[in-house]
Amino acid sequence: MGTRFGHYTDLVPKGFVSIGDKPMILRSIEVLLSCGITRIVIGTGYRCEVYEELKKDYPMIETCFSPLYAETNSMYTLYNTREVLGDDDFLLLESDLIFEPKAIRSLLDCAFSDVMLITPVTKFQDQYYVEYDSEHTLTNCSVDKDDVDVKGELVGIHKLSHAFYDKMCRDYEVILSEQPKLGYEYELLRMSRSVSPVYVLNVPGLKWYEIDDESDLLYAEQYILPYCQ
């Protein structure tokens, strides 16, 4: 719900916070369209009606409301979209990002079907740190650097096949009641460790930033936005 943004999210979801003169979600949509994406599904919760308004200008957008958004987390939101997504392979994006088109193109060009995008550790934010083996298979991730052999940090953009997502949802159903607040990152890790490998694509030099609060917003406007226009 973007509580760290204070008044910025009193009336709109976090993705509608503007960087420069445009909301983050609109920037993401424009990048996706420029890369040839023709269908966009948005999992909604807080202030869902704001996302509904988007569909008037972007007819390729579909929404899927999660009535449990306040008591669950990102994995439940993803799980909740399963009927809307249907049999499609898809890209999974978080709403609080700014990124250059290279992020999307790198995933689309990657030969692997189930892919986590990361970059080398360069920022000073709180991040999900990622570890992978010699085959680039995801082996660990954590917000604590000391827990992993850090190879990079999670961007928050992924490519998933329908076959993988279907297995992911079935695996999550088993633990849903015990872990309603599970983030999708940790379900990806569960899958990669025991069900189906997730390939980690490490892209040096990629310009992106996760925007969680006002200080992130100021940093991104000064140092990242010029590369993402």
Cite the ranges covered by each PLM segment.
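N-terminal nucleotide-binding beta1-loop-alpha1 segment
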Residues: 1-10
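Conserved beta-strand segments of alpha/beta enzyme cores
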Residues: 15, 60-62, 137, 197-199
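A structural signal for short hydrophobic beta-strand segments in well-ordered beta-sheet cores
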Residues: 16, 130-132, 200
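Conserved N-terminal catalytic core of the sugar/cofactor nucleotidyltransferase
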Residues: 22-90, 178
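Short catalytic helix/loop segments, enriched in acidic residues and glycine
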Residues: 11-27
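Conserved core of the sugar-phosphate nucleotidyltransferase
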Residues: 100-175
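Conserved alpha/beta core of the MobA/IspD/sugar-nucleotide pyrophosphorylase nucleotidyltransferase superfamily
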Residues: 153-229
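Short beta-strand-to-loop acidic/aromatic patch adjacent to the donor-nucleotide binding site
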Residues: 88-98
